[in-house]
Amino acid sequence: MDFDGKAISSALLEYTGDVAARAMRTDFDLLAQIARTLIEAKERGATIYTAGNGGSAATASHICNDLLKGCRVHNREGFKTECLADSCAVMTCLGNDFSYEEIFSIQLRTKAHRGDVLLVYSGSGNSPSSQFSSNSWA
């Protein structure tokens, strides 16, 4: 396989153009509302739970790290967070013994309290385990 610098440059240019176009469609009012919800949860001592499958699980885990540690950089207490996708043992236990569609909702019914917050990350929005109704856990 030959290295084709022009093809790689072209692909990178197309990719960055796509990222820039998507960034311009960001709903910043919605992001501000989400930030407000997270800050209010922190102020009342609530836990912020995150969930996702595959790459979205990695994103869900990473935001927990950022919320927990990121504030400490500025001499503020971090947020109480937990990623429901971080334990392979728990996820495979629940999936095997009950249903993979319920790997997150079972954890929430056990751990979560009224007023806690759930952030679900999904690239497609189609994963049954990432689809929650307001009554499925709270």
Segments predicted by a language model, with ranges:
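Generic N-terminal amphipathic, Lys/Arg-enriched alpha-helix
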Residues: M1-T26
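Hydrophobic packing residues in well-ordered alpha-helices of helical domains and bundles
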Residues: L12, L31-I34, A60
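A short, well-structured juxtamembrane/interface segment
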Residues: M24-R44
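Glycine-rich, small/polar surface segments that engage phosphate groups of diverse ligands
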Residues: E40-A112
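A short, small-residue-rich loop immediately preceding and capping a beta-strand
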Residues: T47-A51, R114-G125
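Short, well-ordered, mixed-charge alpha-helical segments that flank or form enzyme active sites
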Residues: M91, R114, S127-S129
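Non-DNA-binding regulatory cores of transcription-related proteins
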Residues: K111-R114, L118, N135-W137
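Glycine/threonine-rich flexible loop motifs
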Residues: N126-W137
